[in-house]
């Protein structure tokens, strides 16, 4: 191996060279921690809060009964996760609440009693819920935080900026304050008509004008504008508390007679009673911070106070006068996240409120002597509220399990939609846009492309959620001053000298030793200025706190002790980008990938991709199908291991030990302490999307295992790294026009070697029920089915495991009794005694759907006789899993990680593909036109670096914004060229990958007169490039020994252009056409790219129908593959048929192929008998039209007699006015077919028919002339 190779990873044995320049200061946190912690909070605190809220429940009068809840516990789940998925059950735990009943009339306290409160769905260790057998994820909701918001809007009349304020509680009535251009501040209570703010102040106890003016005299001091006085003058009739209360009451309760006591009670309840008004912990925290109230600590008082309202009005005046800044409602300091625990808590609260209401009603009517807690409490509202949330909420989603990355992303997703959130239609541009406060908190790249763009986001890699629901991101603390007794001073450089009484204790620029620290620490407490340095101390900050600091970028240059190397540092301060000296810097980013989500962090060279394409790349990685032979990327970013670790699909050793047993089903590790760790492997498990999870051990029996080592991989991981696609040799060139419009040319080798083969599993189910007509039976004895169709069924009529099945094959045989009437009790008894004669049964077997095939991999049978818990009237339940091995085919969608996607247009034979000078055919041909306009150059850099890694036999990690630069890539290509020239690369077919012989390459370079060791040493950037160019120019007959740097590159470029041969550092090769053997005109970019096969497979899309189901009303074929529907033939397609004059085709399309019921039946019959298809009849849609016209009150009738087109001679005779007698017409025009064959009618005769029609005469067989004057016309 070449000396530049790093050592293999101890845990996995994988050689991966990292090009990261920056150290990893903070490890990537647990990526699903948000879900897990939130649900634990719900179990431990959220539920306790709810129970304390409703306890105790008293009857309406308050003197009969009192029900107290004094604690709760979760018991053990009834079924395991595995059993729940197999039996379509919900993974849940029973909740029991300890209740104590007090009879007020007698003072009796009954014994505490455990009340069953229903089964609560339980979160699995992977952050998901299993409901009805399917895994679901509760997505976190991003919505405006409770609190007070001051915004500015220009007055339309005067253009003056005026303050508008919203006070949003967690629960209760909104207060909206507005300023008018006449300086009146008014308030709307819960969206009602506005009143001057002075009226509200009087109602809450500030009744006198002087009292109100005194509250604001310090603030409302603008000589031109007097807001409070203007508001008082606005309503001169209201001068005291009672008139103010009555005024507000009459607006809030317009129908009720106003009364001062009722009004006071209403206002107290509305704003000052915690039962009805709750700012919430978050709201109180935000209000205190925004209003800078002295009671800074968030206490228990979460209702509003009079002081809060006064402080809000003071702030409104300050904002109007320009003394305070308005709020940005899209700032992440003003938007919070409701995680799963809070969402479940809110739903649970709804159920408990209903439960409380029912309990209070029962308390009033129940017998006091016989009463028990269970008689008062009805748990149904709680159970149904929770069930409704997990089953029907917009935020409880069917988990995206296409691959491990899709799972993680689903769990880290943030949605601005859902109950209480935004809707697609109402959301404007501002709320969807990237905001500066998203930095390090929400990924600016990953969001859907459709109508949800910007409304659904993804948490950034290092972000976390604090106790108030705000997103925090970590920063490293920068110190430029420390206290003189701080031990961190030891080893630091002083910025200014330290002296005492004129004596210098330590000079500026000197390093503080242990001895000098002892002297300094004895001085009186003071700050010591040191050279600014970045500490290892990490602080997590929410967005509003971060705005107060100046923060340096993660790639700021530091020395090994953490001192800044530059005098001017690029940094951020709120939304400004600044350049500041080091002593002004407060914090520093922890990592360049801190900005991005997991999916975006998996894109190498992300910094070279356009944001739109990066978005597509991040989203398409989630759609990649796990392949049969998982292969980790040649060029990775280093996040692959973290993504695989937290997906839960890779098994890591908990403790060190020795593998005592390794099978395909389980791994047993004997630990050093003598215990045994057992790990069960998942085998061919179907995901929600029909892909396959199949874990397999990657260790051997007897192997020593370290703690944290990878024991087993899954379908989309290799050696503990995410492996979503395949490393392919790609060429960027056009080839026979097959890569037009981003189409992809694929080599047959990839099909033959199953490179892009994936496994897809479908699940089919059948129930045998008790019907009204008798019992359904699962059996092999099916009427009118031949032995050929039954050959794979066992004696019970169930398919055997391993059988290969195709469309319409029977999976489970079942017969259902036929019959029109239900049997009476007597008939049932007689049948039971005397046995049954051969009953009429119909075949209702479970069959493979149209177009599906595969191999049966598992069958499960649940039976009432075996004691299985089945739904009512179900006796037997059979589940069959069928797996398909799908090879890649024309029409499948492939993609890279840079948003470069396309559909396979041709799978060409290996011998026809373009091939390299050493005879290696390329695997994939991509269109070069797809690169410049898309501006995703990351794919080219990946191709080049991948090629160097491929030839030299190592894999690469290049983290986002901290990876390999141009020089590094050129050096890597140069080294691979030098190794190839030295014959040091082993390309033998028995090696899975090429490998390079270090010594051979170094020796050869030495012979050429250069230092081989230096060339393969990373500490000499640019040397390998220079040497390779000199040697290449020498081969080309040019002496370049005296050239270097830009001159050398220029010379190489000129020679390359003239000779049409690529230099070693451009990553191009001369390719030959596999069909002709001739070289292509220009050198072609060839390299190694990681390619994914997406779940949009052609086999799921292509569909054909001969006959099938029809719509009930229109009688036209249904649409869509799922309904086994037909192809829509719309208005525009009809126009196309007109244009080509294809009358008969058009007629068929609109009649027998669509909704002519009789015609299509006859057509089918004719085809079966081999006869000509007769002419069509009247389409059903015509009848629907007639009915619709009749419903409008138009007397439309269909003349139902059949009309025959007369021969041309007859028509001419009619045109001349020779009308036959009525009996002649009857005799001549017999009721034959509706339409005669018109082929033998000449153009003239057709015109004659039209003329006849123009004369308002219709020849019909009902013995009368229909003239213009006739009623019926």
From Swiss-Prot:
GO annotation terms (biological process): DNA-templated transcription
GO MF annotation terms: DNA binding; DNA-directed RNA polymerase activity; ribonucleoside binding
Entries under Gene3D superfamilies matching the protein: 2.40.50.100, 3.90.1100.10, DNA-directed RNA polymerase, beta subunit, external 1 domain, DNA-directed RNA polymerase, subunit 2, domain 6, RNA polymerase alpha subunit dimerisation domain, RNA polymerase Rpb2, domain 2
InterPro entries, per database record: DNA-dir_RNA_pol_bsu_ext_1_sf, DNA-dir_RNA_pol_bsu_external_1, DNA-dir_RNA_pol_su2, DNA-dir_RNAP_su2_dom, DNA-dir_RNAP_su2_hyb_sf, RNA_pol_bsu_bac, RNA_pol_bsu_CS, RNA_pol_bsu_protrusion
Region: Disordered, residue numbers: 1252-1273
SUPFAM superfamilies registered for this protein in UniProt: beta and beta-prime subunits of DNA dependent RNA-polymerase
EC numbers, comma separated: 2.7.7.6
Keywords assigned: DNA-directed RNA polymerase, Nucleotidyltransferase, Transcription, Transferase
Keyword S-adenosyl-L-methionine: no
Intrachain S-S bonds: none
Pfam family, one: RNA_pol_Rpb2_1
Reactions catalysed, as given in the entry: RNA(n) + a ribonucleoside 5'-triphosphate = RNA(n+1) + diphosphate
One Gene Ontology cellular component annotation held by this UniProt entry: DNA-directed RNA polymerase complex
Domain of life: Bacteria
Record's function text: DNA-dependent RNA polymerase catalyzes the transcription of DNA into RNA using the four ribonucleoside triphosphates as substrates.
Family: Belongs to the RNA polymerase beta chain family.
Assembly, per entry: The RNAP catalytic core consists of 2 alpha, 1 beta, 1 beta' and 1 omega subunit. When a sigma factor is associated with the core the holoenzyme is formed, which can initiate transcription.
Protein name: DNA-directed RNA polymerase subunit beta
């Amino acid at each position: 191996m070449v000396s530049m190779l790093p050592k293999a990873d101890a845990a996995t044995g994988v050689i991966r060279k990292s090009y990261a320049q920056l150290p990893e200061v903070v490890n990537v946190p647990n990526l699903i921690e948000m879900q897990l912690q939130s649900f634990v909070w719900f179990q431990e605190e959220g539920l306790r809060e709810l129970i304390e809220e409703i306890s105790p429940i008293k009857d309406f009068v308050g003197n009969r009964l009192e029900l107290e809840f004094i604690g709760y516990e979760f018991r053990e789940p009834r079924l395991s996760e595995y059993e729940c998925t197999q039996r379509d059950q919900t993974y849940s735990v029973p909740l029991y609440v300890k209740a104590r009943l007090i009879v007020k009339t007698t003072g009796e306290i009954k014994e505490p009693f455990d009340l069953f409160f229903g089964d609560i769905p339980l979160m699995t260790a992977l952050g998901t819920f299993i409901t009805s057998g399917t895994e679901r994820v509760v997505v976190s909701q991003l919505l405006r935080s409770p609190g007070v918001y001051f915004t500015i809007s220009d007055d339309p009349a005067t253009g003056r900026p005026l303050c508008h304020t919203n006070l949003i509680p967690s629960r209760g009535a909104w207060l909206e304050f507005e300023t008018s251009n006449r300086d009146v501040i008014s308030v709307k209570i819960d969206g009602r008509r506005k009143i001057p703010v002075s009226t509200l102040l009087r109602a809450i106890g500030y009744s006198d004008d002087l009292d109100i003016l005194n509250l604001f005299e310090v603030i409302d001091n603008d000589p031109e504008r007097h807001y409070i006085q203007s508001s008082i003058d606005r309503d001169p009739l209201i001068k005291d508390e009672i008139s103010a209360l009555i005024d507000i009451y009459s607006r809030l309760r317009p129908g009720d007679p106003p009364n001062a006591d009722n009004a006071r009670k209403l206002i107290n309840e509305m704003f000052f009673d915690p039962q009805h008004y709750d700012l919430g912990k978050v709201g109180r925290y935000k209000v205190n911070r925004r209003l800078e109230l002295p009671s800074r600590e968030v206490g228990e008082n979460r209702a509003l106070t009079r002081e809060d309202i006064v402080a809000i009005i003071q702030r409104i005046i300050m904002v109007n006068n320009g003394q305070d800044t308005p709020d940005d409602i899209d700032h992440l300091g003003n938007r919070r996240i409701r995680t799963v625990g809070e969402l479940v808590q809110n739903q649970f609260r709804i159920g408990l409120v209903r439960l409380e209401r029912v309990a209070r009603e029962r308390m009033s009517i129940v017998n006091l002597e016989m009463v028990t807690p269970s008689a008062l409490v009805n748990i149904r509202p709680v159970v149904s509220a929770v069930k409704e949330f997990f089953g029907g909420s917009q935020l409880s989603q069917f988990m995206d399990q296409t691959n491990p990355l899709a799972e993680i992303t689903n769990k880290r997703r943030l949605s601005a939609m859902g109950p209480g959130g935004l809707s697609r239609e109402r959301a404007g541009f501002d709320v969807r846009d990237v905001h500066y406060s998203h930095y390090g908190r929400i990924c600016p790249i990953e969001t859907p492309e459709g109508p949800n763009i910007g409304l659904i986001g993804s948490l950034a890699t290092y972000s976390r959620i604090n106790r108030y629901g705000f997103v925090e991101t970590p920063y490293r603390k920068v110190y430029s001053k420390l206290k003189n007794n701080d031990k961190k001073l030891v080893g630091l450089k002083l910025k200014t000298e330290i002296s005492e009484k004129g004596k210098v204790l330590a000079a500026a620029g000197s390093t503080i030793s242990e001895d000098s620290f002892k002297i300094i620490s004895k001085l009186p407490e003071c700050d010591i200025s040191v050279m600014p340095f970045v500490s290892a101390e990490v602080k997590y900050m929410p967005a509003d706190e971060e705005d107060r600091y100046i923060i340096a970028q993660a790639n700021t240059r530091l020395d090994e002790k953490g001192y800044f190397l530059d005098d001017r540092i690029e940094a951020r301060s709120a939304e400004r980008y600044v350049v500041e000296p080091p002593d002004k810097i407060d914090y520093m980013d922890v990592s360049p990938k801190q900005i991005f989500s997991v999916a975006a962090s998996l894109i190498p060279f992300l910094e070279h991709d356009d944001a739109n394409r990066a978005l597509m790349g991040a989203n398409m990685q989630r759609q990649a199908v796990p392949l049969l032979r998982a292969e980790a990327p040649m060029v990775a970013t280093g996040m692959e291991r973290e993504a695989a670790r937290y997906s839960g699909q890779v098994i890591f050793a908990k403790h060190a030990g020795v593998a005592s047993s390794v099978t395909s089903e389980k791994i047993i590790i004997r630990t050093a302490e003598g215990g045994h760790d057992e790990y069960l492997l998942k085998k061919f498990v179907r995901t929600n999307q029909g892909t396959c999870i199949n874990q397999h051990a990657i260790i051997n029996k007897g192997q020593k295992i370290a703690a944290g080592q990878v024991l087993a991989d899954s379908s989309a991981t290799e050696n503990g790294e995410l492996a979503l696609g395949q490393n392919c040799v790609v060429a960027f060139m056009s080839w026979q026009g097959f890569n037009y419009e981003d189409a992809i040319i694929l080599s047959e080798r990839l099909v033959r070697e199953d490179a892009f083969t994936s496994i897809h599993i479908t699940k089919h189910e059948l129930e045998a029920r008790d019907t009204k007509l008798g019992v359904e039976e699962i059996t092999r004895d099916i009427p009118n089915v031949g032995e050929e169709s039954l050959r794979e069924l066992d004696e019970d009529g169930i398919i055997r495991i391993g059988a290969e099945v195709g469309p319409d094959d029977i999976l489970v045989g079942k017969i259902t009794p036929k019959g029109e009437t239900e049997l009476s009790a007597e008939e049932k008894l007689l049948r039971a005694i005397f046995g049954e004669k051969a009953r009429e049964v119909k075949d209702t077997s479970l069959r493979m759907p149209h177009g599906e095939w595969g191999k049966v991999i598992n069958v499960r049978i649940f039976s009432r006789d075996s004691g299985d818990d089945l739904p009512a009237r179900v006796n037997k339940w059979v589940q069959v899993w069928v797996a398909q091995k799908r090879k890649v085919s024309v029409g499948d969608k492939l993609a890279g990680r840079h948003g470069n996607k396309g559909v396979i247009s041709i799978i060409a034979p290996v011998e026809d593909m373009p091939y390299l000078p050493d005879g290696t055919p390329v695997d994939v041909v991509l269109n070069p036109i797809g690169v410049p306009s898309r501006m995703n150059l990351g794919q080219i850099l990946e191709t080049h670096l991948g090629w160097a890694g491929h030839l030299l036999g190592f894999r690469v990690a290049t983290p986002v914004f901290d990876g390999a630069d141009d020089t590094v890539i050129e050096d890597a290509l140069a080294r691979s060229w030098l190794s190839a020239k030295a014959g040091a690369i082993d390309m033998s077919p028995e090696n899975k990958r090429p490998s390079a012989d270090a010594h051979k390459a170094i020796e050869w370079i030495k012979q050429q007169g250069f230092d081989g060791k230096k060339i393969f040493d990373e500490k000499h950037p640019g040397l390998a490039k220079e040497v390779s160019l000199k040697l290449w120019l020498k081969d080309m007959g040019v002496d370049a020994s005296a050239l270097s740097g830009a001159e050398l590159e220029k010379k190489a470029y000129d020679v390359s252009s003239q000779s049409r041969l690529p230099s070693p550092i451009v990553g191009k090769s001369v390719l030959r056409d596999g069909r002709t053997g001739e070289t292509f005109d220009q050198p072609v970019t060839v390299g190694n790219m990681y390619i994914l096969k997406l779940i949009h497979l052609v086999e799921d899309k292509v569909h054909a129908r001969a006959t099938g189901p029809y719509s009930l009303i229109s009688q036209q074929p249904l649409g869509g593959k799922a309904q086994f529907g037909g192809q829509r033939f719309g208005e525009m397609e009809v126009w196309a048929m007109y244009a080509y004059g294809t009358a008969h085709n058009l007629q068929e399309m609109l009649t027998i192929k669509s909704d002519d019921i009789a015609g299509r039946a006859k057509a089918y019959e004719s085809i079966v008998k081999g006869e000509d298809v007769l002419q069509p009849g009247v389409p059903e849609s015509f009848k629907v039209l007639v009915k619709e016209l009749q419903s409008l009150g138009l007397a439309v009738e269909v003349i139902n007699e059949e009309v025959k087109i007369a021969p041309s001679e007859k028509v001419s005779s009619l045109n001349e006015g020779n009308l036959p007698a009525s009996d002649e017409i009857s005799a001549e025009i017999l009721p034959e077919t509706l339409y005669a064959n018109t082929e033998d009618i000449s153009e003239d005769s057709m015109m004659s028919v039209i003329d006849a029609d123009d004369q308002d005469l219709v020849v019909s067989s009902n013995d009368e002339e229909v003239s213009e004057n006739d009623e019926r016309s």
